A protein has these predicted regions:
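N-terminal helix-turn-helix DNA-binding core of bacterial DNA-binding proteins
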Residues: 8-46
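Feature captures hydrophobic
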Residues: 37-38, 45-235
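A generic alpha-helix surface/boundary motif
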Residues: 7-8, 172
Length: 235
């Protein structure tokens, strides 16, 4: 790990947290992922060996704890790791407000999008009985064009293969459109009205889709307005 050669606490924190992928791994831990495979779903373009290296470094730095047996480790945030939560949230909110660029194809990832949605959609919006929502992304890579979110008894499951249940709602759109909705670049209902998103199913369910889907937590935070400022007596 390269050093900035500075005693400044910011520089020392950056030496640890600003290595490629490190802060994204911390984001996944803050979001609730505790197992290697679950963390990997949030960083699908990160190699397993690099993820292992970053987790090892975070353990050595005291940011996370590793427990369990080899091959079945559980990772949890330490006190130091938990204190990163507001930092990560503000970093993401700042990114939503100031670092957003137009989405390019390289930025689009159906697996990451659906995994993020799976842990954020609000199951309380739908009845407690099983509700199956199918997502179709015709322009996504082969093998990532169809996804199913199954809402039942307050739980959400994500399936890449047909779960074999009756589908209640079908949502069909370009991957970029749903990504824009998820990151609050446009509203779901507005995209439906424009014809960018096609929705099929019971109107009692489709009318609630915008509330059910919600949006990226970091984008929601960034959309709230001006971020808090810390007192820094610069002259």
């Amino acid at each position: 790990m390269n050093s900035y050669g500075q005693f400044c606490p910011l520089a020392q924190a950056a030496q640890l947290l600003c290595e490629r992928w490190t802060l994204i791994v911390v984001r996944e831990l803050i979001a609730g992922s505790t197992r290697f495979n679950k963390i990997k779903k949030g960083v699908p373009r990160m190699s397993p060996s690099l993820l292992s290296a970053r987790l090892k470094r975070l353990v050595e730095a005291g940011v996370i704890e590793q427990s369990g047996n080899k091959g079945n480790y559980t990772y949890s945030l330490t006190e130091a790791g938990l204190e990163l939560r507001p930092i990560v949230e503000l970093f993401g909110a700042w990114g939503h407000r100031w670092a957003r660029s137009s989405l390019n194809r390289i930025d689009l990832d159906a697996g990451l999008l659906m995994w993020d949605m799976r842990r954020t959609v609000d199951p309380a919006v739908f009845p407690s009985c099983r509700i199956v929502v199918q997502f179709e992304y015709p322009d996504a890579p082969k093998g990532a064009r169809n996804w199913w979110l199954v809402s039942e008894n307050g739980e959400i499951d994500l399936c890449l293969s047909d779960p074999g249940h009756n589908v209640d709602v079908v949502i069909k759109c370009p991957l970029k459109t749903m990504t824009e909705v998820w990151t609050l670049r446009q509203r779901f209902n507005d995209a439906v009205k424009k014809g960018d998103i096609k929705v099929m199913g019971d109107s009692k369910l489709t009318s609630k889709l915008q509330d059910w889907l919600g949006a990226s937590p970091l984008s929601r935070l960034g959309a709230l307005g001006e971020l808090p400022r810390l007192a820094w007596n610069a002259k």
